[in-house]
Every structure is written in structure tokens, then in C-alpha cells.
């Protein structure tokens, strides 16, 4: 029993390394197979290292010739599968049973096998394989089927044949000296005579491959001829197209489309540039037209100024003739002669223009000039005037009252009216100038003399007006350039002052409408009594703050000027007032003030429209 157990144990121990060896071999072969599949370049490089079968046949043929020349020498053993490592390893390891059969072959058998192989190759013409074409070692085309027994090849299973297809990893297997190359081995084995025969064999092989090369050359020549014919046809078409079109190239459709698109883009760019030039010219012409319109307007303004001068001159003549306040009899006789002598064409033309501007019939205008009377009969004597002989002698300082002239010329009836009644006639009933001044906290019109100039600084700058005398020469008059800026500045300052007063009055009226509690408090305090100074101060501060907020929106410069005016606004009863029963402004008075302001605005609008109409005429 013990011997049997030891026998089984030894067998098991011997099987274990055998199993490991088998599994390692299979794993190595599998890994090598996968490596060659993943990297076919490596496989091609290894396959290219084998000699081609034609070279092997040539070497066998040379060996046969050498045997015929030297029969005493033994033929060397050339294995056609010299580069394959797997069969040779198996021959060395375990296939010793086939060696006696191989050794039993004689030289005659070898020669017979080689001759049959060469005859078969000559009978079956094959295309010359490429130099770098990999050769399958077990292919049936290279070797006949009946030669398998002669070459003593072992019948491998299919699994092992797959491994046989792949080349060995190293060429040095089965060589006597692995450090020598193939050409060195051949040089050692062959003599100069064998090399000469080898050259003859290669010449014969070149003759066999000659027809194929000739076929290739013929194909190349035919292809060249075909391409030459195509070039000739293309040139002929080009020549014909150039004759028809007129020298243009026969371009393809894409090139034509590209050229058309480029031309269209160029045309569009040229059109845009032309349009821009036209627009620039139009703008320039428009600017010139605007300048011409400005010149026309200036000429119209000058004409209207001249007309206004003529009208003022005639009106002064009428007033002077009507009043009868001429200085001496010579002036009276001169005025009567002026109206008695016949009118020339220029004066008639001037009268027609005056009647057209004033919208008065010419007959009425002539009657007015002759009689010097007004239709309403309210002729007031003006200040004494010296009648100038020429229109150019009128000083423009006398024409600095455009509002006076407008009020005279543009009344409701179409005839002149005085300046003093212009403001009082427009006031509604029950509302006087004193009420408005009390509302604004100013003095009455009787106690306050309105100064024409806003400040004494401008009054000092005004040049004195020189009286006109008939004997005074033109050299004594001041030039226009010296005193015109002062007159214009004075007029602008006066207009700005009037505008500011009007804006202040309108704003105070709006404040009274917005804060009706001020009026109610005034009505309650009509009974004479002494109000608390703290309440008065609070109300005054509220009103002053509201006025400052309003003025900050417009301009910060007017805030300091208008703050004392707001302080003078009567909120409560005055502290030191001699008239305790002072009348306060009520709602009716406020509505009257608003009506008056609206009426003034409407009159100003009508005057502006009439003035524009006169200028356009």
C-alpha cells in the first residue's frame, strides 16, 4: 500500500510541472498570435526575411549542376523550411523516428524530385511575385501534393498549422553560425564557377519575365498616347471656343460664377460710392439753399426795418401837422407844400406798401396823412419833435420802443392807440394794478416811479441823446458802431426784466391755487388782531422752501434774487401796520389775476402772428 501511494504521489508531482509547461506554451502561442494580429507590420518584416521559393529552386538547380560536376562530393542538406523554427525544434526534440527514412533517400531521388519541381514550374506559368510579398509556407501552389511524403513533412493538425503560418522571431535558428549573414554563407559555399552558372540562371529567369514587362510597357505607352490625345482634343476645343467667343479662356462653370459674383460686388460698391457722392452733393446744395434762405430772411428783415422807419417818419409828420406845433412859419409852409405838391411814383409805391402792411385802404391812408386825425378822436399831443429832412437823419435811439409801435399799430380796431391805456384796458372789472402789486408785495404805481433801466450801472453807460437841429452837420452825429451795442444791451436787459416779473407773477398765482389754505387763513385773519410770530415764521419758511424748490429746477442763479420777494408776501397780518383793516386777496381776485395773465398771453400770441405776417409780406 505504501509503495502504491508513493507511486501515485510521484506521478502527481510529475504531472504538475507538465501541466504548467503545457499551459505556458499555449499562453505564449496565444499571446504571440494576438501580438502579430495587432501589429501586422512586425509580421511583414519577419516574413520578408525568408528567401523566396524561386531563389530556393535556383539554388537547388545550381546544386544539381554542382553534383554533376563533382559526383564524389556529398550533397548538402538544404531544408526548404530552413527559417521555420517550430518544425526544426520538433525534429530536434522528438521526431527522430523520421530521420532514418530521410537518410535512406539517395542522390538520385533528390535529383528526381528537383527535376520534377522544375518541370512543373515551367509547365505552369505564373506571374512574377513581388519582392516584398509575404509567402505562405504551407501553400499548395508552391509545392505539389505528392511531394509531402518525399519531403517528410508531418501532417499537422489544424490548430498547429495556424501556428506554422507565422514566421519565427529570429532568423538565426537552425544555422551553424548565427553571427554570419546569408550572403556570407553563400560566398563560402559556392565557387566562381557556381556563381557564373547562377548569373546564367538569372538571365533565363529574366527572359521568362520579359513578356510581362513588355505588356506593362505597352500599357504605359497606350496610356500616354491616350492622355496625349485628350490634351490635343482639349486644345482643339479651346481654339474653337476662342474663335467663337473672341479670345476668352474656356473656364469651367465655377470660375464663371466666381467672376460674376466678383463683378456684381464691384458694381454694388461703385453704386454705393456714387450714391454717397450724390448725397454729399445734395447736402452741399441744401446747405447753400439754407444760406440763401437766411440771406432772403435777412433782406426781408432789413426791408421790414426800412418800412417801419418810413411809417414812424410819416406818423411823426402826421402828428406834427395835426398838432400845429411847428416851430416857425417856414416849417408850417414846408409841411403844407409837402401835402399840396403832387406825389411822385416812388412816394406812391411807398404808400401802397404801407397800406398793404397796415391793411388800410390807400384812400383812408391819404386822408389820414392830410388831416392828421385819428378815427377815435383821441389825439394826444406828443412831445415836440424836429422834423428831419431825410429818413437817414432819424436816430435809431428813437426806434427803441417796438412794443410802443406794436401797441399803436396792432390794436383791435386797426388804428393807433396810446401806450398808457394799453395795460389798463385789458384788465378785468374789479381788478386794478394796485391789487396786483399788493399781491406781489410791491409798492403802488403812484408812489413808485418805474425806472426804465434795470440798474444804475447800465443807466450810466447810456449815451446822451443829441437834439436834432436843421443846421447841424452830419459830422457832429455819433457813428452807429459806437452806440448801437449799448442800445441793444439796454433793450435786451429790459425785455429780460419784464419776462422775469411775468414768470414770478404766474408762479405766485399757481402757488395760491395749489395752497388754498393761505387764502383761507387770510380770510380768517381779516378781524384785526395780533398773530403769533412763530406761526407766521413757519408759514413763511414753508412758502420760501416751496419757491426755492421751484427755482432750483429752472436756474440756481435766480434763487437769491427772488427769495426776498417771497418774504414780502403777506401771509399773516403785518406786525407794525397802521391799517389793521387791510383788505386781503380772496378767490375772486385770484381768478381775475389768472384771467388777466391769460389775456396778456393771447394778445402777445396775436401780436407775434401779425408781426410774422407783416415780415412775410
From Swiss-Prot:
GO terms for molecular function: chemoattractant activity; cytokine activity. It comes from the Eukaryota. One of its GO terms (biological process) is angiogenesis. The modification Phosphoserine is found at residues 174, 268, 432, 532, 555-556. Its main location: secreted. It is found in: Secreted. Residues 123-147, 552-583 are annotated as: Disordered. PROSITE patterns: GRANINS_1. The modification Sulfotyrosine is found at residue 151. One of its GO terms (cellular component) is secretory granule. Residues 1-27 form the signal peptide. InterPro entries: Chromogranin_CS (IPR018054), Granin (IPR001990), ScgII (IPR038858). The keyword Signal applies. Keywords: Calcium, Cleavage on pair of basic residues, Phosphoprotein, Secreted, Signal, Sulfation. It holds the Pfam family Granin. Residues 28-30 form a propeptide. The keyword Zinc-finger does not apply. Belongs to the chromogranin/secretogranin protein family. Neuroendocrine protein of the granin family that regulates the biogenesis of secretory granules. Interacts with Secretogranin III/SCG3. Binds calcium with a low-affinity. This is Secretogranin-2. It comes from Macaca fascicularis (Crab-eating macaque).
Amino acid at each position: 500500500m505504501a509503495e502504491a501511494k508513493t507511486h501515485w504521489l510521484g506521478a502527481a508531482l510529475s504531472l504538475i510541472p507538465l501541466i504548467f509547461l503545457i499551459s505556458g506554451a499555449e499562453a505564449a502561442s496565444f499571446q504571440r498570435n494576438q501580438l502579430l494580429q495587432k501589429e501586422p507590420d512586425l509580421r511583414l518584416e519577419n516574413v520578408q526575411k525568408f528567401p523566396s521559393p524561386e531563389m530556393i529552386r535556383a539554388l537547388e538547380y545550381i546544386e544539381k549542376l554542382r553534383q554533376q560536376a563533382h559526383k564524389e562530393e556529398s550533397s548538402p542538406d538544404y531544408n526548404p523550411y530552413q527559417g521555420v523554427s517550430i518544425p526544426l525544434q520538433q525534429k530536434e526534440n522528438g521526431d527522430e523516428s523520421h530521420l532514418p527514412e530521410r537518410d535512406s533517400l539517395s542522390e538520385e531521388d533528390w535529383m528526381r524530385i528537383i527535376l520534377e519541381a522544375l518541370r512543373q514550374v515551367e509547365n505552369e506559368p505564373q506571374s512574377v511575385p513581388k519582392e516584398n510579398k509575404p509567402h505562405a509556407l504551407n501553400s499548395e501552389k508552391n509545392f505539389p501534393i505528392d511531394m509531402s511524403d518525399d519531403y517528410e513533412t508531418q501532417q499537422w493538425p489544424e490548430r498547429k498549422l495556424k501556428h506554422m503560418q507565422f514566421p519565427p522571431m529570429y532568423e538565426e535558428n537552425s544555422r551553424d553560425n548565427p553571427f554570419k549573414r546569408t550572403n556570407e554563407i553563400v560566398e563560402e559555399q559556392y565557387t566562381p564557377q557556381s556563381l557564373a552558372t547562377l548569373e546564367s540562371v538569372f538571365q533565363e529567369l529574366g527572359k521568362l519575365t520579359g513578356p510581362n514587362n513588355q505588356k506593362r510597357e505597352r500599357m504605359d505607352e497606350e496610356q500616354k498616347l491616350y492622355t496625349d490625345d485628350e490634351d490635343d482634343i482639349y486644345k482643339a476645343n479651346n481654339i474653337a471656343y476662342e474663335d467663337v467667343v473672341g479670345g476668352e479662356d474656356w473656364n469651367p462653370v465655377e470660375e464663371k460664377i466666381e467672376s460674376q459674383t466678383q463683378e456684381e460686388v464691384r458694381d454694388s460698391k461703385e453704386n454705393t460710392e456714387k450714391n454717397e457722392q450724390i448725397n454729399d452733393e445734395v447736402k452741399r446744395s441744401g446747405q447753400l439753399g439754407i444760406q440763401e434762405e437766411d440771406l432772403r430772411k435777412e433782406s426781408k428783415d432789413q426791408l421790414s426795418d426800412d418800412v417801419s422807419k418810413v411809417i414812424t417818419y410819416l406818423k411823426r409828420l402826421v402828428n406834427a401837422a395835426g398838432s400845429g406845433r411847428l416851430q416857425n412859419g417856414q416849417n408850417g409852409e414846408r409841411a403844407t407844400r409837402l401835402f399840396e405838391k403832387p406825389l411822385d411814383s416812388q412816394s406812391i409805391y411807398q404808400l401802397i406798401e404801407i397800406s398793404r402792411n397796415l391793411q388800410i385802404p390807400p384812400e383812408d391812408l391819404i386822408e389820414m396823412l392830410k388831416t392828421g386825425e385819428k378815427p377815435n378822436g383821441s389825439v394826444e399831443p406828443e412831445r415836440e419833435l424836429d422834423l428831419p429832412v431825410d429818413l437817414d437823419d432819424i436816430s435809431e435811439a428813437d426806434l427803441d420802443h417796438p412794443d410802443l409801435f406794436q401797441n399803436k399799430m396792432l390794436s383791435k380796431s386797426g388804428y393807433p392807440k396810446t401806450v398808457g391805456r394799453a395795460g389798463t384796458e385789458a384788465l378785468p372789472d374789479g381788478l386794478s394794478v394796485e391789487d396786483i402789486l399788493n399781491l406781489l408785495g410791491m409798492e403802488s404805481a403812484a408812489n413808485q416811479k418805474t425806472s426804465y433801466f434795470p440798474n444804475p450801472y447800465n443807466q450810466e453807460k447810456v449815451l446822451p441823446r443829441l437834439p436834432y437841429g436843421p443846421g447841424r452837420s452830419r459830422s457832429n452825429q455819433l457813428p452807429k458802431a459806437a452806440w448801437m451795442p449799448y442800445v441793444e444791451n439796454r433793450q435786451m436787459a429790459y425785455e429780460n426784466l419784464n419776462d422775469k416779473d411775468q414768470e414770478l407773477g404766474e408762479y405766485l398765482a399757481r402757488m395760491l391755487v395749489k395752497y388754498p389754505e393761505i387764502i383761507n387763513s387770510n380770510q380768517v385773519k381779516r378781524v384785526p388782531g395780533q398773530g403769533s410770530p412763530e406761526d407766521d415764521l413757519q408759514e413763511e419758511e414753508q412758502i420760501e422752501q416751496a419757491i426755492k424748490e421751484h427755482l432750483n429746477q429752472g436756474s440756481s442763479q435766480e434763487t437769491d434774487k427772488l427769495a426776498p420777494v417771497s418774504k414780502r408776501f403777506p401771509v399773516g397780518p403785518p406786525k407794525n401796520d397802521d391799517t389793521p383793516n387791510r383788505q386781503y386777496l380772496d378767490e375772486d381776485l385770484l381768478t381775475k389775476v389768472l384771467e388777466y395773465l391769460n389775456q396778456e398771453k393771447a394778445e402777445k400770441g396775436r401780436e407775434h402772428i401779425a408781426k410774422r405776417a407783416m415780415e412775410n409780406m
